[in-house]
Each structure stands twice: as structure tokens, then as C-alpha cells.
């Protein structure tokens, strides 16, 4: 069975970026199952439902698993950012994560090759894309640029582009010396919450 996921940040009871998560869920279902009925995540998510003793955690991760029949599973857990201090460049031209599949085996296999680094930065067809868990942006000291062709067009990325905080750009590994800082972000990692110097990206 083909399953997909949405990972949604709940910040002290506030569901973040819900409209974009909802749009991606329904776009995915329409692509794979054109006859599917649109769903409203708000019908399934509720901040009281995040309870069972974890609402006091502050930041909660809601993990929604869905497929052809609709929502298959919904779980909540306290969330803490996993710190990343180094990235290993990893080349692959075959990986495809256009849709947020519950099956992450290709990403997990690449992640296992990271060596002493904390995470990987995937290079596809000569261009930087994403880490194993996040979109990225690079700063030249004036502007923030995000790869124009990420593996997954994340909901946080879409919001930052719309707000004018990010600009899309084709970025190659050989362009890295032009930048000073790399930021990682996704639905759970806020903008500016996780960054490291570009010199900590290793071939």
C-alpha cells in the first residue's frame, strides 16, 4: 500500500502552516488517486487531542499518515531539534522524493553513509538539494538562497519564498565557497533555529 505523511508543528497548541499541509496532502492524493475526495486536516487535528500529557512539552509533532482511503494514522509526540554541526555531500542522480512518502529507505541508505558527519547534503545531477530531513538555504552575507530543485518542496520553504525571505537558485558544490552560512529548516525546524558554517560541509 502506498502511504504518505505530513509532519505538522503544533506550537503551544497552535497548529502551524495548516493550509499548506492540507494543500500538499490533497495534491498528493489527487496525483495518485484522481477520484479521491479532498480531506480537511482540521477535521482530524485538535490541540486537545495532542494531549495525553504532552501538550505541556511546548512544541509537539503531529505525524499524519495517509493513503488512498484517507487518514490511516495520526500520532503526537514532543519535539526537540536534533542538532547538526556537520554535513557530508552525497551524490545520487536516482533518488526521487517529490512526494512525501512514508517509505524513506533511499534517504536512510544515503544517511547511513555520512561517516563522522551529523547529516548529509544530497547532490543530484550536479546541484545541491536537501539534507536527509530538511530543505536548506545558503547566505552570502546579503541574501538567502535555496536550491531551485529540492528533493521535496517543503511547506516552510513555500512560506519563506512567499514572504520574500528566500530566493531560488541553482547551486553547485563548487559554489559553496561563495557562501558563509547554511540553514536547515522544515515544518518542525523554524527559520534560524538550526544553522552552521559552510566550512562544515565536507566532500
Where do the model's predicted regions map?
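Conserved alpha/beta cores of soluble small-molecule-handling proteins
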Residues: 1-127, 143, 149-203
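Short beta-strand/strand-turn micro-motif
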Residues: 129-135
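Short beta-strand-to-turn element immediately C-terminal to the catalytic PLP-Schiff-base lysine
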Residues: 138-139
Amino acid at each position: 500500500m502506498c502511504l504518505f505523511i505530513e509532519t505538522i508543528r503544533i506550537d503551544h497548541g497552535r497548529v502551524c502552516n495548516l493550509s499548506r499541509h492540507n494543500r500538499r496532502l490533497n495534491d498528493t492524493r489527487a496525483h495518485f488517486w484522481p477520484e479521491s475526495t479532498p480531506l480537511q486536516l482540521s477535521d482530524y487535528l485538535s490541540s486537545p487531542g495532542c494531549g495525553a500529557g504532552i501538550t505541556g512539552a511546548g512544541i509537539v509533532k503531529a505525524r499524519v499518515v495517509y493513503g488512498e482511503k484517507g487518514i490511516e494514522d495520526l500520532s503526537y509526540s514532543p519535539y526537540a531539534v536534533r542538532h547538526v554541526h556537520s554535513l557530508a555531500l552525497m551524490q545520487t542522480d536516482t533518488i526521487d522524493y517529490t512526494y512525501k512518502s512514508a517509505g524513506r529507505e533511499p534517504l536512510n541508505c544515503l544517511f547511513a553513509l555520512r561517516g563522522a558527519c551529523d547529516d548529509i547534503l544530497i547532490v543530484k545531477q550536479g546541484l545541491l538539494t536537501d539534507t536527509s530531513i530538511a530543505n536548506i538555504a545558503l547566505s552570502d552575507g546579503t541574501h538567502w538562497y535555496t536550491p531551485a530543485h529540492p528533493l521535496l518542496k517543503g511547506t516552510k520553504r513555500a512560506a519563506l519564498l512567499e514572504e520574500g525571505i528566500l530566493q531560488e537558485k541553482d547551486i553547485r558544490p563548487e559554489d559553496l565557497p561563495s557562501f558563509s552560512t547554511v540553514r536547515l529548516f522544515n515544518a518542525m525546524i523554524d527559520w534560524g533555529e538550526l544553522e552552521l558554517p559552510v566550512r562544515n560541509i565536507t566532500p
